[in-house]
Amino acid sequence: MAFFTAASKADFQHQLQTALAQHLGDKALPQVTLFAEQFFSLISLDELTQRRLSDLVGCTLSAWRLLERFDRDQPEVRVYNPDYEKHGWQSTHTAVEVLHPDLPFLVDSVRMELNRRGYSIHTLQTNVLSVRRSAKGELKEILPKGSQGKDVSQESLMYLEIDRCAHAGELRALEKAILEVLGEVRVTVADFEPMKAKARELLTWLGKAKLKVPAEELKEVRSYLEWLLDNHFTFLGYEEFSVADEADGGRMVYDEKSFLGLTRLLRAGLSKDDLHIEDYAVAYLREPVLLSFAKAAHPSRVHRPAYPDYVSIRELDGKGRVIRECRFMGLFTSSVYNESVNDIPFIRGKVAEVMRRSGFDTKAHLGKELAQVLEVLPRDDLFQTPVDELFSTALAIVRIQERNKIRVFLRKDPYGRFCYCLAYVPRDVYSTETRLKIQQVLMERLQASDCEFWTFFSESVLARVQFILRVDPKSRIDIDPARLEEEVIQACRSWQDDYSSLVVENLGEAKGTNVLADFPKGFPAGYRERFAPHFAVVDLQHLLSLSEQRPLVMSFYQPLAQGEQQLHCKLYHADTPLALSDVLPILENLGLRVLGEFPYRLRHQNGREYWIHDFAFTYAEGLDVDIQQLNEILQDAFVHIVSGDAENDAFNRLVLTANLPWRDVALLRAYARYLKQIRLGFDLGYIASALNAHTDIARELVRLFKTRFYLARKLTAEDLEDKQQKLEQAILGALDEVQVLNEDRILRRYLDLIKATLRTNFYQPDGNGQNKSYFSFKFNPKAIPELPRPVPKYEIFVYSPRVEGVHLRGGKVARGGLRWSDREEDFRTEVLGLVKAQQVKNAVIVPVGAKGGFVPRRLPLGGSRDEIQAEAIACYRIFISGLLDITDNLKEGEVVPPANVVRHDEDDPYLVVAADKGTATFSDIANGIAAEYGFWLGDAFASGGSAGYDHKGMGITAKGAWVSVQRHFRERGIDVQKDNISVIGIGDMAGDVFGNGLLMSDKLQLVAAFNHMHIFIDPNPDAASSFVERQRLFNLPRSSWADYDAKLISAGGGIFLRSAKSIAITPEMKARFDIQADRLAPTELIHALLKAPVDLLWNGGIGTYVKSSKETHADVGDKANDGLRVDGRELRAKVVGEGGNLGMTQLARVEFGLHGGANNTDFIDNAGGVDCSDHEVNIKILLNEVVQAGDMTEKQRNALLVKMTDAVGALVLGNNYKQTQALSLAQRRARERIAEYKRLMGDLEARGKLDRALEFLPSDEELAERISAGQGLTRAELSVLISYSKIDLKESLLKSLVPDDDYLTRDMETAFPALLAEKFGDAMRRHRLKREIVSTQIANDLVNHMGITFVQRLKESTGMSAANVAGAYVIVRDVFHLPHWFRQIENLDYQVPADIQLTLMDELMRLGRRATRWFLRSRRNELDAARDVAHFGPRIAALGLKLNELLEGPTRELWQARYQTYVDAGVPELLARMVAGTSHLYTLLPIIEASDVTGQDTAEVAKAYFAVGSALDLTWYLQQITNLPVENNWQALAREAFRDDLDWQQRAITVSVLQMQDGPKEVEARVGLWLEQHLPLVERWRAMLVELRAASGTDYAMYAVANRELMDLAQSSQHGVCIP
């Protein structure tokens, strides 16, 4: 409906006038406008604006037309339904218009008639208009309200809108009735003064007449008439009559000339029956009294809707007989009912007489009580009741004042037309219901046709109800007042009375009385109407059974009056009512269709409320169960759903359909929620419907689970397997009958999951012996079909209605953080992505990757930060408990399985966790829970607690990432500690990684940064002052960019809210960030900042801001940052430092790298945090053993941990340094060695260790394209491969004997601060993770120094295992002291060009590679690290010092050239000498072996070896072999074979030379002699070299032939040595 609006009443009148002008001429408009102002003057603006303006215009014009012509002798009444076509306006109501000369009672009387007929009045407008009319009644003028004058008349105009009358006959009948009422008003008003005159006339007559009446009585009657005339009576009519005798009574004989007022209308045309009166009425009318009272037989239609009162003056003859009666009909005015009885003539005499007869002292209690009773008695009773009856009644009322009981006093009207009843009821039991019961008894016993009542409350304990009942005067019902009173008492015997009796009867008097006192108001009226008291007693007992442990009780019942399919259940609980919107879905999900609900509240005297909810329901379609048989499990299910222990969803229907208890249903739901997380493809509702459609299979699945994890405790392995097989076959057989493919798939996946479940806490009670509120399941992920990749080794799923979470582990010894996720729908997908990154990040530490995530499902909506945090912590505790519930423990070195847990897997006691997003401060909580469980790791369970290393305080993650940044810039000739670099950051100074990172150097020029709230812009910052300000913000708790001192920001900068509509781009911002626009939205500005030319992009925030151009935003999965994100190729930062996780997609990193950017990956850059935590855990495991042995207190342990903080940090940063260095070394040769990486990836894929697509590594086709483009693998891709190579090597070492080798286990010491190795060396060798730590240290050391493909390359070329390769490497490492030389090179940072450093390291790597290969080829399975290092190490050290003295000819020249190059570059001489001779150092291995064979001095053998090489030009030949291009693996293997052959042949010739008989002693002479003795073959060899030098191009075939020639030469001596 369209309403109008108006600012004021004047505004409304203006709008109305404007609208009226469209319907009226200029002449009529002023008058109608004036009329309208008066017409609506009494109506509020609010009421007017609830109506259409068009309707107001219509009713105004309609009323005006009524007013235009009026005959004052004939009132105008119009009752009609406004219709647009007929009347020009319309309304949903019926309109009533009345125009009448202004008279009293008009409005009240019309309104009374409408109410009497049952019409609701919606609009009522009444106005008294001052008008001038013509003689014909035509309206001449409307005058201002209240105008007077000779020709001015006052006319009452009424406009009403009432309920719509549907029929024309109804409209006519109403119009006629209103006209009748108006007629009655007219005669009443017209005769009002004549009636008063008649009263005065009677008053005069009484003063003159000589009546045989006591003077006092006469005086009181006269006083009464005077009092009546003094505005105490509204005269409606007057009549005079006498009584004539008839055989069966009498007859009223009216004097028609006496009629005044209403009697003129009411007495016309009375029939004989109307005039007949009964004999008792005749007797009353002939009583010789002057003044009498009665009630009229019909209600008044004028002024007030009540039965009018008769006040009669009887004229007596000289004998005291009644001659006639002068009777006034009217209504006592309201003042009469408020006036004291002592001020009302006639009544006051009665009251005084009653007081006198009582004998009560008026100042005493009873006297005051009686006076009060008389004061408040209904005036009708006081007027009409004789003194004798009044006395007895008043005294009886006084007697009950102090007693809580019901009394009834009945009095008949003298005419027999009414019965008057006063009922006194105790206030505390009085109600409408009580009044209706009394009324019903009275109506039935008195056969009354109508009843009016008035209720009176005073300070008394009793309430009084006055009933006036209309009865048939002809009926002669003999009523026994005592019996009637008893019937009323019985009728009023309340439900509460019966209830109270039953409570005492059932609970005993003492308890019952107390309970009734506890619930003083008992059950509410609505309850009492529906239930008998004995039901209430049962319900009360249920309420009394409520407790904290049992907060909800449920009861089913079936009313006898209802069908079998309709049931009821009652829910009982305390405090707040159950919301229907909450309960209804629960019942419906249980398979019940709710038909209605009736809530009832009981209030305890202590203020606590108790509730009963009565639900009527039937079964949902398709359900056919016996509710009584399932009563217990259904009640149990409902109670746990309401309490939140179980979820409310479609799975609950299984309670009825499958007869499953709620926990079994919850079990199936938990599996379904896991199925959702592993992306089965069906929503939970469909999964539930599949189970409900096949309840037999659902039951069997639960049986299988119970058998595996409960019955298995009591069964032998054989019996368990037999039972499982039978159940599985039964399920498979049932599945064959399933017709719907999707349902079959769901049910089979349930079977798969149950079989893949290794452990569960489902049957593990809590400390109180109760079922746990959460479930945890340990899975064998490889047994779950179609699990999203990568597939972890183990997985634990924790489920409860409050929280869900998963923990994924890559192996038995695995570690990673637990994050508070907000992705309820796919948190496992989030965790899977993180564990994938964690797996490669953990390549540098002992454990393999693990990750966990939990989602609080019931965070308080609109809760405060503290409330949300509290709930998250509670959920975290549940999650941690779920993990520990099914994890083995260690006690005194023995594995202790968890109690009441059936294990279908091996011992698995290693479980450690760490902080992650949202759980940074939760480590102490986790360790506290671990302590409660007595878990063997103690506070090593969760690193970073109060007795652990504070990552933010140490700044370890940022420092580790800064190592990467330093390397990127160092390799570009920039020292970030000395040279200014421009930075754009993601995050704020309150953050750990961002804040610590931007304090790593005071040379950083932070030109821009942003977080979720602000954008910080400082186009031309001062590095020094901005550093100090950043430091201040970092130290300021909960700081933000808004706290930054704006005075320190350079011109054109500022701090802007991300919520701003737009940001003005200053010239300085345009210049710094290469922006063209004048204004940008905050999102657009951040987008531009990410693409700005800058030295460093430092990511310390949360979110993914860079994708590849081949990816969509949807692929990224970070919707919040879609508007900010840029492509990798759009980045113009020179370097990206990834302190935060997931800032770039992997493909974005690759794209950035391919476009010249310098970056690693997040798991490389920010590995410091996880590395630090691993050191902490390993140290604590070590020291906890020491504490348990009594060799140290926990306090001492904690002090030692603090003392080692810097040492631990140094170890961590050393790992970061080494790993990024290894990446730089790999990147140098990434293009030329691309085939090696291809082979590595292929091998890892073939062994199921790598999913190339999942890790975004290039396919073979993409590698071919890279080769064509002259590109190799990027650092981001190499980061993945270095991690995988370490992981793979660690696994291989753990499966071998390498970690058990006494010599090799010394590497373990490098994982700990030196202080620990010194003090607790023995305990360290007993470390529970000794094998893992040794394997980790060797793998890290090997890959960091020898390269990513080293192990793979040597495995392929030697056929040896990875463990053999690692063992040989350790020998080589220690024989040649490689770590020492690497450190010497690393110490040259910023002293020599980075490229020189990498070249030096390349040479060391080549030495290590060739030497390792030599050991593998020469020793095979006879490697003995301790022996070989002892044998070769000292001799190589000795020879190495004088290597340059041993070299000669071209060999020496080559060495000298290299040496000089290095020295010229700034390399220290000793280091330059060593590295320049690495290729010759390698030859010391065959030299030493030749020495062993010949028994000659090693130095002499070396001279011979190098002399042979010089004589045969083998150094040049070796260089040619080394320079052979490698395009495939076969060529690589051939090249290595050529070198091996050359090594053997040179050694063989050397041995042959040294073993010559009768030769000269000098080496040169012996070599010369040997050459002469083998001259033909020597010449053939030299000729071969000539051809090789002359060849325009060389290929492998040529060198194969050349090698054969050399072999012939080597074997030509009888002293040839067999190839090892």
Swiss-Prot record:
Sample GO molecular function, one term: glutamate dehydrogenase (NAD+) activity
The organism's place on the tree of life at top rank: Bacteria
Does the record bear Disulfide bond in its keywords? yes
Induction info reads: Expression induced by arginine in an ArgR-dependent manner (27-fold). Induced to a much lesser extent by ornithine, glutamate, and aspartate (1.7- to 5-fold).
Gene disruption: observed consequences: Reduced growth when arginine serve as the sole source of carbon and nitrogen.
- Alphabetical GO biological process terms: glutamate catabolic process
Q: What does the UniProt record say this protein does? A: Involved in arginine catabolism by converting L-glutamate, into 2-oxoglutarate, which is then channeled into the tricarboxylic acid cycle. Can also utilize other amino acids of the glutamate family.
Name this polypeptide is given = NAD-specific glutamate dehydrogenase
Q: Which organism is it from?
A: Pseudomonas aeruginosa (strain ATCC 15692 / DSM 22644 / CIP 104116 / JCM 14847 / LMG 12228 / 1C / PRS 101 / PAO1)
User: What lineage does the source organism belong to?
Assistant: Bacteria, Pseudomonadati, Pseudomonadota, Gammaproteobacteria, Pseudomonadales
